[in-house]
């Protein structure tokens, strides 16, 4: 058992990749597997009795992280320690003991219960598997659990379809408590529920945590849920944790641009908030099959760092960055643009440039910046994407795409070049900046 000073759960360098083109036929045809980096080297710990929130947009890897932490998925790399033991080394009795001490509450209360079983049978299933108590003792324990979660012991013989969504989620929570676990992974436990029911379930989880000394990992995309329940928050983007810290600090003083943008997306009721400046996230989420170099958020970041010596309005620089991203990801079709111009013979280069410029930019440019952008558009008109991309990279490349920032060894770290980075990252930044002089 971990000492009082040690975390109950410790995650170190956890990776979970899924591979495409990796079947037998693909191999016979000589195709290379493509890695989808769902979780890409994350590290954090959870203290006993704590609730850690894991928040981010859909598809960022939150649920995969949770599933891998409880061995519903096997990792590609990294370790998860529970009470000081690497869970991926466990088998036999050791693995069975871990299953007892670690439970899950799933997102969808409608599909997480077997419709052919009564709710009593569903709650008793874990006790049956682990051979806990006699049949009579299991039934009594089940009735106690139903009352703990705000239902009636007399409902033990009813079927799931006889209950509302909120009641079904309470049943799922009762099932998770059946083995008296120390740790529960809550995967979006309220997202499928009406707003009026969400607070009831969250309050229940808090009451149960106090009564049974539980430790939670709460996965959610809803920041209001995170703020209501959690002690600390880890913010996840494209398979990586970009910021982690105490919940009050995260909400009052977010350090990472992605965290700030998430918080800005939360509706504000106060009229004093009208007309406030907002960091709006633009662009599409990159594919985990081919994540961006450097900081994974840099293709959408409102605060992306300009190269030394380049003095532009930040919004104008963001437009150039989006133009570069579209070029690099093949999202500018030269043929379609000529068709839109109505010049299939590709003779009116000026019309091509004007059409594309109107779509890409709302700002005007001057001097060398204008010359580079104009020349890159001209190269596109000539179907020379490689030169167009190189011109933009030479002039507008950011440190954010060259050096990947990391989380500092502090209570509130942020993986961003806008906050102080460790010495080895700072050295890489200086080396790159020296090449730009």
Regions of interest found by a model, annotated:
Residues 87-103, 129, 250-254, 286-292:
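ABC ATPase NBD coupling module
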Residues 85-86, 136-154, 263-264:
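Conserved ABC ATPase "signature" region
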Residues 4-7, 20-26, 247-415, 419-425, ...:
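Charged, flexible cofactor/metal-binding loops and thiol motifs
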Residues 78-89:
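Conserved ABC transporter NBD signature motif
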Residues 178-182:
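A short, proline-enriched helix->beta-strand linker immediately N-terminal to the Walker B motif
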Residues 189, 193, 197-276:
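P-loop NTP-binding/switch modules centered on Walker-like glycine-rich loops
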């Amino acid at each position: 058992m971990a000492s009082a000073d040690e975390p109950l759960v410790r995650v170190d360098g956890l990776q979970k990749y899924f591979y495409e083109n990796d079947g037998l036929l693909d191999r016979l045809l000589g195709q290379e597997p493509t890695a989808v980096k769902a979780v890409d080297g994350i590290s954090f710990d959870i203290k006993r009795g704590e609730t850690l929130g894991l928040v981010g947009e859909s598809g960022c890897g939150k649920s995969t992280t949770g599933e891998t932490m409880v061995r519903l998925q096997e990792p590609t790399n990294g370790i998860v320690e529970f009470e000081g033991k690497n869970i991926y080394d466990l088998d036999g009795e050791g693995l069975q003991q871990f299953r007892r001490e670690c439970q899950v509450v799933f997102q969808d209360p409608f599909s997480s219960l077997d419709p052919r079983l009564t709710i009593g049978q569903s709650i008793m299933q874990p006790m049956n598997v682990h051979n806990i108590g006699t049949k009579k003792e299991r039934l009594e324990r089940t009735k106690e659990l139903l009352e703990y979660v705000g239902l009636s012991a007399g409902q033990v013989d009813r079927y799931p379809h006889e209950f509302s969504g909120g009641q079904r989620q309470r049943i799922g929570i009762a099932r998770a408590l059946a083995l008296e676990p120390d740790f529960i992974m809550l995967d979006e436990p309220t997202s499928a529920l009406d707003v009026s029911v969400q607070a009831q379930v969250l309050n229940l989880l808090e009451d149960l945590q106090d009564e049974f000394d539980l430790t939670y990992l709460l996965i959610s995309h809803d920041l209001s849920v995170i703020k209501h329940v959690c002690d600390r928050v880890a913010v996840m983007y494209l398979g990586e944790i970009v910021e982690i810290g105490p919940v009050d600090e995260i909400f009052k003083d977010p350090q990472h641009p992605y965290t700030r943008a998430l918080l800005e997306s939360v509706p504000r009721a106060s009229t004093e908030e009208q007309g406030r400046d907002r960091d709006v996230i633009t662009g599409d989420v990159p594919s985990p099959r081919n994540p961006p170099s450097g900081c994974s958020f840099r293709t959408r970041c409102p605060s992306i760092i300009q190269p030394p010596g380049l003095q532009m309005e930040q919004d104008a620089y963001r437009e150039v960055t989006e133009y570069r991203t579209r070029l690099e990801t093949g999202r500018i079709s030269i043929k379609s643009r000529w068709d839109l111009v109505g010049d299939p013979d590709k003779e009116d280069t000026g019309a091509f440039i004007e059409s594309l410029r109107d779509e890409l930019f709302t700002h005007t440019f001057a001097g060398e910046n204008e010359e580079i952008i104009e020349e890159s558009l001209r190269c596109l008109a000539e179907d020379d994407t490689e030169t167009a991309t190189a011109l933009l990279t030479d002039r507008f490349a950011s440190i954010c795409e060259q050096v990947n920032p990391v989380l500092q060894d502090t209570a509130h770290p942020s993986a961003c070049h806008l906050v102080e980075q460790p010495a080895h990252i700072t050295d890489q930044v200086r080396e790159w900046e020296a090449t730009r002089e």
